[in-house]
């Protein structure tokens, strides 16, 4: 009796091969011809064999690179949004550690505050930055603001004049909502305490802002031209209750007496004078 030997059925790929792929005859999966790792895997589910597509090694590397770029872009957009919201004066963008000229040794305390931010935040520890006019208090605070914003921390740096201008004319409920919005920021920095108008309304609103921040248990940084003695020995109850709240939560930091603003102005004038003296007037024909 004649026996017929059946020719084995050839196993073929379950989809069309791309130009950079080949079919592995051993495990019957499609492979990448560049990295020689599979682009398919085999799973058995309820008695059926499934062969889904997967990323080979080089595809996975490209995917991870693209994902890293996407996350970086999202982070940059988030930081830009935080800066737009938190830095209400464009000049504040330049108040960074990278632009520090080393004149104020106290700037190391700003570095330390940023480095220990999580602990400062947990303890609701703020700073009271005080000193004479033009000594770099706003720059000190701005460096902290920008450094934390770069880390993705929501920071608002503003001043009481701006706050009071916003609150003026608002109804009671609207004022409360505005003050509550200030507390959404992880760090609130208020520049130039003491230069705002000294009316009963202004003092009441300044207290409301400080007291609300105090009760929120979130850090507050204040800059002021007032001396520590003036803050500790307020002239009246209205000022005392404001200053007491600040001194309870904010570590005093004195910025030295050198007038950096005046030094910068003098340097700019010297540079302008040098330009004028070194450039000859054009010939008049």
Residue ranges and their predicted role:
Residues 121-141:
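Walker A/P-loop nucleotide-binding motif
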Residues 87-91, 96-127:
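Pre-Walker A (pre-P-loop) alpha-helix and adjacent loop at the N terminus of AAA/AAA+ ATPase modules
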Residues 95, 151, 184-185, 216, ...:
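Structured helix-beta-strand junction loops
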